[in-house]
Amino acid sequence: MVLLVVDTQQMITNNKLYNFEVFEERVKCLIEVARKNNIEVIYVRHDDGLDCELTKGKECFEIYEGFAPLDGEKIFDKTVNSAFRDTGLLEYLKDKGEDTVIVVGLQTDYCMDATIKCGFEHGFNMIVPEYTNSTFDNDFMSGEKTYKYHNQYMWNNRYAKCVSFHETVGMLNS
């Protein structure tokens, strides 16, 4: 089992996200509990490319201070929505014999969605703890509706197990 923290970068980890305070508190807690139990915490960052704001080398590309990786924790960079495509993450997890991925991060309707579905397709048991992913309002749906659509309808029992926060803490502690 690993804890995968997706795209919690400085540019997009802010209070404009749906339910930001709960998201922030829960992700911090899961990182802490995973570390306490020697469960590997792995980070993923999204790089939009040289002519974009969210690109390697810019401060906003770095992981949000509240979730910052410790020295030695793995960070994989990606240029597409899925954390599994051409990043080395898939091979890394397979080589370690991992089969369960607890996934948290941003954004619900972009990289979280792609990562959960691709992880499922690669045979991983994908676990999504309640209120540990988020997104922004858009022209079509509020961040809240987007969150509920993915977590309560699209992912649960199709591509992932969407479980309570407390159940996830129990998994990490066992």
Spans of features found by a protein language model:
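Active-site-adjacent betaalpha module
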Residues: 2, 29, 35, 54-174
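Active-site loop/turn elements of alpha/beta-hydrolase fold enzymes
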Residues: 8, 46, 131
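A short alpha/beta connector and helix-capping loop motif
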Residues: 16-43, 47
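Glycine-rich, proline-tolerant flexible connector loops at the mouths of alpha/beta enzymes
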Residues: 48-52
